[in-house]
């Protein structure tokens, strides 16, 4: 089997723990690289956009007339390569970001798109309102056999699903906001999680994304 290269966007945010979690999979044919420019992106079979600060990441993609932003849009919508956004990364993959004009001047070009959802940033409050929850896995993928938990840090909230193509992979309950809160979604080549899977010991979502990239490359 030829090498599979998964990139982790390394402009800002929690990229090193993501890299370490993929290394934990111990797959000899898997190559993990940091992505900081268009050249790096061109080496990737799949890409992870980690948690961090979505407006900061978007500003980092704006240099040289949106060169990296445009390359990422091409990666997602033209090449249709697998991409996974966690927390802030999920925000950047969302079609609609609520009240984004209050936070940035990018307008309709704030997010890359790919997930037909409406999302709300920092829904649960500040850093002090972060929490760990149990996931209710809806997917039948073998990657998700074990009981899984999720770390939600200034997590976004998926307000609405806008297309039948969007599949819910996992939900959780919150004492203040009720049950069946969407934790993970998938639409074609795009995967989104509102939590930080790289901050807990399990590698289930890294395994799931690796399988997604492998299926893309060898389909």
UniProtKB/Swiss-Prot annotation:
Keyword Glycoprotein belongs to the record: no
A single BP term in Gene Ontology: pyridoxine metabolic process
Catalytic activity: aldehydo-D-ribose 5-phosphate + D-glyceraldehyde 3-phosphate + L-glutamine = pyridoxal 5'-phosphate + L-glutamate + phosphate + 3 H2O + H(+); L-glutamine + H2O = L-glutamate + NH4(+)
Superkingdom, natural source: Eukaryota
Intrachain S-S bonds: none
Main location class: cytoplasm
A GO-annotated cellular component: cytosol
Known function: Catalyzes the hydrolysis of glutamine to glutamate and ammonia as part of the biosynthesis of pyridoxal 5'-phosphate. The resulting ammonia molecule is channeled to the active site of Pdx1.
Family to which the UniProt record says this protein belongs: Belongs to the glutaminase PdxT/SNO family.
PANTHER family reported in the protein's UniProt record: PYRIDOXAL 5'-PHOSPHATE SYNTHASE SUBUNIT SNO (PTHR31559), PYRIDOXAL 5'-PHOSPHATE SYNTHASE SUBUNIT SNO1-RELATED (PTHR31559:SF0)
Subunit structure: In the presence of Pdx1, forms a dodecamer of heterodimers. Only shows activity in the heterodimer.
Name of the protein: Pyridoxal 5'-phosphate synthase subunit PDX2
Organism the protein comes from: Plasmodium falciparum (isolate 3D7)
Gene (name only): PDX2
């Amino acid at each position: 089997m030829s090498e599979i290269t998964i990139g982790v966007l390394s402009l800002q945010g929690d990229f090193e723990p993501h890299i370490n979690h993929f290394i934990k999979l111990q797959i000899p044919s898997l190559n993990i690289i940091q992505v900081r420019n268009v050249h790096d992106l061109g080496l990737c079979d799949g890409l992870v956009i980690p948690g961090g600060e979505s407006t900061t990441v978007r500003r980092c993609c704006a240099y040289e007339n949106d060169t990296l932003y445009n390359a990422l849009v091409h990666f997602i919508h033209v090449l249709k390569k697998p991409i996974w956004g966690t927390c802030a990364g999920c925000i950047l993959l969302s079609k609609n970001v609520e009240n984004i004009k209050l936070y940035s001047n990018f307008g309709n070009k704030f997010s890359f798109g790919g997930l037909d959802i409406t999302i709300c940033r920092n829904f649960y409050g500040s850093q002090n309102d972060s929490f760990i929850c149990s996931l209710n896995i809806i997917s039948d993928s073998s990657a998700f056999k074990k009981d899984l938990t999720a770390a939600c840090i200034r997590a976004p909230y998926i307000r609405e699903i806008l297309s039948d193509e969007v599949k819910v992979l996992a939900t959780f309950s919150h004492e203040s906001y009720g049950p069946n809160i969407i934790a993970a979604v998938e639409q074609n080549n795009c995967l989104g999680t509102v939590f930080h899977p790289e901050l807990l010991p399990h590698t289930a979502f890294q395994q799931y994304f690796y399988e997604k990239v492998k299926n893309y490359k060898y389909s």
